[in-house]
């Protein structure tokens, strides 16, 4: 059995990283951490937030700076593993499952830096990074033979749709970047509060 895990929001808690960078780039922002994430978890993007709350009609300079800074070590060091994930990955490996990391990160160095930092580097059979150039499906298809017994686990609608396109089971977790109500619209095979609640059969 193959299990494909998304990284940000699914295995690691990146909420603080995104919020702190937003506050840095928009210093006039008085949005609290919870206010910012209430918006984001309801699928309200930065372009809409900038226009509605700050009167910024051209979001391109913001987006450019965001992409430049979001994967720097300064901000990556704000990330932390979701509770119990290390033990969970050990549990899955002991079941002789094939685990893959599939992420939309731009830069491999930040991914490997965090995997080494968290002690996860040897848990995965392969680490697939789209570099914001390819879809997750594009990376998985030519490299790994999948079947209907396999899973993809993520916290976004895109992850669920990837599973459907690959004809594998899609598992959503609701403690990441989208709310349970938003995730339900994509009709995953199951939704869990956190990744460690998922136990593949």
Which residues does each predicted region cover?
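Asp-based, Mg2+/Mn2+-dependent phosphohydrolase catalytic module
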Residues: 1, 112-201
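N-terminal helical cap/lid subdomain that shapes the substrate entry/recognition surface
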Residues: 2-87
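Conserved Rossmann-like nucleotide-cofactor binding loop
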Residues: 10, 17, 107, 158, ...
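Short, surface-exposed alpha-helical segments at coil->helix boundaries
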Residues: 15-20, 47, 108-112, 137, ...
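Short, flexible loop segments at the rims of nucleotide/cofactor-binding pockets, characterized by
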Residues: 75-80, 104-106, 129-132, 170
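Substrate-recognition element of Asp-dependent hydrolases with the DxDx(T/V) motif
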Residues: 85-115, 130
């Amino acid at each position: 059995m193959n299990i494909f895990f998304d990284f940000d929001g699914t295995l690691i808690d990146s909420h603080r990283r995104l919020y702190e960078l937003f506050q840095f780039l928009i210093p006039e922002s008085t949005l609290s951490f919870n206010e910012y994430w209430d918006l984001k978890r309801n699928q309200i993007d930065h372009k809409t937030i900038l226009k509605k709350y700050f009167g910024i009609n051209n979001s391109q300079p913001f987006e450019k700076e965001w992409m430049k800074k979001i994967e720097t070590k300064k901000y990556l060091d704000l990330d932390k593993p979701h509770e119990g994930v290390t033990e969970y990955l050990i549990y899955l490996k002991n079941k002789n499952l094939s685990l893959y990391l599939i992420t939309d990160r731009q830069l491999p160095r930040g991914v490997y830096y965090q995997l080494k930092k968290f002690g996860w580097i040897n848990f995965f059979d392969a680490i697939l990074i789209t570099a914001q150039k390819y879809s997750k499906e594009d990376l998985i298809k030519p490299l790994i033979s999948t079947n209907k017994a396999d899973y993809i686990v993520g916290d976004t609608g895109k992850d669920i749709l990837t599973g459907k396109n690959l004809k594998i089971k899609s598992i959503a977790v609701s403690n990441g970047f989208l709310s349970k109500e938003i995730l339900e619209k994509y009709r995953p095979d199951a939704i869990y509060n956190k990744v460690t609640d998922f136990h593949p059969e």
